[in-house]
Amino acid sequence: MRYIPHAYQAYCERQIVEKTALALWLDMGLGKTSITLSAVNELKFNRFEVQKVLVIAPKKVAEATWQAEAAKWDHTKHLRFSTVLGSLQKRIRAVNAPADLYVINRDNVKWLVDYFRNDWPFDMVVIDEASSFKSQQAQRWKALKSVRAHIRRIVELTGTPAPHSLLDLWPQVYLLDQGERLGR
């Protein structure tokens, strides 16, 4: 199917392409996934600015949503996915398979960081449902923070930032700018 973005979608895609760190907070159903896939396609195949993209998502979303959305559109259906889920052996095989995007559930982020240690291969990370990274005490947040300096581009997606307080936003913003705006 031919992708014809709405003006706000085209704007969001440009922002992802032009900025190295961005939070995209749009309501459900407004196309966060297709916007991001379009930007990844542009960055990887037209600008050659990214090689390996990691998508961190809730398990159900990681299982099929990103792949199904990419398959829908003519300009993204060529993207190759590796789903990094399942047993340890399956995850190791998947993370070493050739792909453009690697999709993992958020509960395996610590494992992935431990697996690669100082040889972090993903130059772009997309956090689908960034509000699940609102606790700086969570292992997934600490793990991602430890490799943040090795990530050239990061995009946070959510339709529900819904903090209980401003303190819930600090960890999400920190992952974007490493403490530049709100402190360390």
Which residue stretches match the model-derived regions?
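PAPS/PAP-binding and catalytic site of the sulfotransferase fold
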Residues: L37, E69, S165-D177
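Conserved helicase ATPase motor motifs in RecA-like P-loop NTPase domains
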Residues: M28-G29, I151-L166, Y174
